[in-house]
Every structure is written in structure tokens, then in C-alpha cells.
Amino acid sequence: MVHSISILGSTGSIGRQTVAVADHLGLNVRALTTNRNIQLAEEQARRLHPAFVAVTDEASAKALRIALADTDIAVGGGENALCEAAVISDTDAVVTAVSGAVGLRPTLAAIEKGRRIALANKETLVCAGDIVMRRAREYGAEIVPVDSEHSAIFQCLTGRTGELHKILLTGSGGPFRGWTREATRDVTPEMAVSHPNWSMGAKISVDSATMMNKGLEFIEAMHLFGVTPDDIQVLIHPESVVHSMVELLDGTVIAQLGVPDMGLPIQYALTYPERKPSRSDRLDLTAYPNGLHFYAPDLEALPCLALAMRCARTGGTAPTVMNAANEIAVGLFLGHKIGYHSIYESVAAAVEAIAPVAAPDLDVIRAADQEARAFVRSYFRF
């Protein structure tokens, strides 16, 4: 297991849970980062005593620097400070818990230092999976997934390289499972962020409601495990007990089960290949007397999932465009500026309008990302 970590996005949902896991395991936290939640960042810094705190919002960084003036903790501002946090010395692993494509640069920076990446930022692989995985091989950096589904697949495949036939990627179906497309027209942000099983941040909660999150995970799985879209089957699993499964060449299916608690995959990413006692509840299968259920997703009712699967097949910059457009659209929805159905409509329009580029380098990926963001803002005249 690792002994010292940096937490990128420590004030978000996954970041806060990572702090709790680090406390439980007795890990040394070398760096923290936040966007602008400096009140929580200050509390974390005073408790964990990191060497460095990065704040991407420059004005907030100045305020935190003043607040921590009585300590020896350095405070950096701007996106470059994220990379500083990712490469700070004496760090065994970097937990990438920031939300969105902003996680790409610091992840690559940490990879180039040979650090273990506890990957909770799926957008990094969605946007630049080929590049990230190639760099990880080049620099000998381990990538251990934190997403519960990918952690499950990772655990099921340990020691079984070359034996995989199919990945069975599960998802709860979100708060609107079973609803028709028309029935979701008047969904509000407050409704969308209320997930039945998981405690998550606002953006990923909306993505879970639209099932875009499962689409992003579909693409992430392709890169993490070196498979094609035909090798992945999405299953709706309302109970969120089976976190994913793998079917092996001989027809055997291996599943990873557990309570829906992100503390478990976070801890495993930091203790791998060891296992340590956790603070999570134990799974009691007798609590499910009606059984565990699995069924195919209704892609007509879940167009974001269908769109993501199409972009996965297209490849190139198509997933980058989709992801960037979705980030802007979800932000507008959470701000009560657009309707729920407008998320899909604007993202699909961006994917249709912006031609994909095959085998892009990082400059092309960044350009596609920016073009997609500008497209959605223009689409809604913002």
C-alpha cells in the first residue's frame, strides 16, 4: 500500500471521502487542491498539515494564503498549481478527484513522475485515454481506478490477463429509472441531484440521472482494460450491490459485491495489492429478500447513454467534444438556465456539428474541448 498521497479535489464529494480514508489508514497527505471552497480547504489543511494547497480560483487562493499565514503551508493559485500539487515530492500516489477535463494536465504530470494514480476523474480517460494509458506504460505509473464499477472490474480481473471475454458494466439507473423520456421533461436540478443509492456531487449526480455518467464509464472502461465497445455490456442494476462483473473466456462470470460506499474503492486504490479493514458497513445479502435485479437499459429513454456509446465507437475527438459539451450543459442546468432535456439536445448538437479528428494529440484535444464549450454557450446564447 501507499503511505503518502496528494488529493486533487479534496473539497469535493470523492475528495472528502478520500480525506476520511486517509485518516483511517494513517496516510501522510502531502498536498490538497480545491477550486474555491477555501473554508473547507483551510479546515482540511489545519487538520492534515500538507506541505502545499492549490486553489484554482486565483482570488480564492489569495484569501486562503492570508488565512494560513500563521502556518508553514504553501498556497498556490491557478491551474498550474494543480500540477504542482500532483508532482510534489515524497508522494506515493495522487488521487485525482477533481471534476471535469481540468484533471488531464495534473494526471499526466503525476504519471510522468511515475506516481500511482488513484483515478476518480473519468474525464481524463474520456478525453485522452490513448495518450494517458500510453504515458502510464512509458513511465511505469500504475493507474488504479476509484470509480466503483472500474474498481470492481479491476478486482475481478486481477491475475486474469488475457482471459477476459466481456465486461458487464452495472448502473443503478439513477433517480428516474423506469421513467419514459417524456416523463423527464420537467425534471428540476433538485430532482436530478437526489440519487437513490449513492452520495455524490451535483455534477455527477446529474450525469447519473441522464446516464451520461454510465456512458463516460463505458469509454473509461475501454481505455483502462484495453477493450472495444463490443466487449462491454451495460446492465441496469437498481440495488447497486453488484458493482460490475466480468465474463471470462470459458463462460465463468465473476462479480464484485459490496455496499454502495465510495470509501471502499477509494481505500482499495490506496492499499492495493493489500487489503485493510475499512470503516464501511458490511454487505448483508439477506437484506434483499426480493433478490438482485439486472436488465438492459432503454436507450430511447436514455439518449445520453446512447450518444456516449456512439461516440465511443467513433473515437478520436468525439468523446472529448461530448464530454466538454456536457460539462457546460450540466452547469447551465444546475444554474436553472436550461431545461433537463436541453442537456442531451445541446450535447448531441455539438457532437453533430464538430467533426471528429482521429488520433489527436493533446493540442488537438484541447482545441476540440474549447470548441465544444463555446458551441454550447452559443447554442443557448450565453
Task: Go through each PLM region and give its residues.
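Catalytic, metal-anchored helix/loop core of enzyme active sites in primary metabolism
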Residues: 1-382
